[in-house]
Amino acid sequence: MRKTIIAGNWKMYKTQLEAKEFLEGLMSQLTKTPEEREVVLCTPFTALDFMSKILHGSLIRLGAQNVHWEDEGAYTGEISGLMLKDVGVSYVIVGHSERRQYFGETDETVNMRLKAAQKHGLTPILCVGETKQQRDSGETESHIFSQLANDLVDVDQENLVIAYEPIWAIGTGDTCEAKEANRVIGLIRGKLNNSNVTIQYGGSVKPNNVDDIMAQEEIDGALVGGASLNPESFSRLVNYQ
């Protein structure tokens, strides 16, 4: 069954004190949020244990921003699914464009991370999307279909979320038109073995466009960057109309 999931990706922002202040401002604004909407906060690693204790028993689920494919080992700077599960994480972002661009993430390593997340009962949020050059060259579909074909080898689509993030719209203020995002997400859904996979849109989602985005038939939620750092703007996204 397709779920509605609004997930905030904090990237490399917020100390524990800032996270605490954020939650104090957010929680009171979620009292009327429909129960069927799932809210996820993907925080920096340093905040996971702290946030897990505060969020216990609330409607907000905890997410991480990366996971290694091994359970342990000499992998400096990495974190395992076993470790994430141990601190109460439920979701983990895999294959975000910034990981692919800045840290050499490939479809092969994305695939291994997806399977590692599922091995430990974590729900991965797989990010796929095209660059501005690929879109202008008419390669949007072929690029995304290639990502899906390689990333999802032997991945259980029953425990999976996909986020369509047009790279040219991330942090730029340029938003993919809602109908175009809906079209691409429909194409993504058509390539999956399971039509009930939750598919989010990510890319400059803001209070002034979230209602239009979430009104689209194929869009099940949002993966939010900058607007998730402010409790007022994030609560507006969660409580979209």
From Swiss-Prot:
Give the family, as the similarity comment puts it.
Belongs to the triosephosphate isomerase family.
> Do you know which HAMAP family this protein is assigned to?
TIM_B
Q: Which pathway does it operate in?
A: Carbohydrate biosynthesis; gluconeogenesis; Carbohydrate degradation; glycolysis; D-glyceraldehyde 3-phosphate from glycerone phosphate: step 1/1
Write down the top EC class of this protein. isomerase
What this protein is reported to do is described as: Involved in the gluconeogenesis. Catalyzes stereospecifically the conversion of dihydroxyacetone phosphate (DHAP) to D-glyceraldehyde-3-phosphate (G3P).
Q: Which gene encodes it?
A: tpiA
Localization per Swiss-Prot or TrEMBL = Cytoplasm
The GO terms describing molecular function are: triose-phosphate isomerase activity
Superkingdom is: Bacteria
GO CC aspect terms: cytosol
One BP term from GO:
glyceraldehyde-3-phosphate biosynthetic process
**Family matches, as SUPFAM superfamilies:** Triosephosphate isomerase (TIM)
Gene source species: Trichodesmium erythraeum (strain IMS101)
Annotated substrate binding lies at: N9, W10, K11, G171, S204, G225, G226
The entry's protein name is: Triosephosphate isomerase
Pfam (any one): TIM
Give its E.C. classification number: 5.3.1.1
Q: Which UniProt keywords apply?
A: Cytoplasm, Gluconeogenesis, Glycolysis, Isomerase
Gene3D superfamilies according to UniProt: Aldolase class I
Subunit composition and interactions: Homodimer.
Q: Top-down, what is the taxonomic lineage of the species of origin?
A: Bacteria, Bacillati, Cyanobacteriota, Cyanophyceae, Oscillatoriophycideae
Show the catalytic activity: D-glyceraldehyde 3-phosphate = dihydroxyacetone phosphate
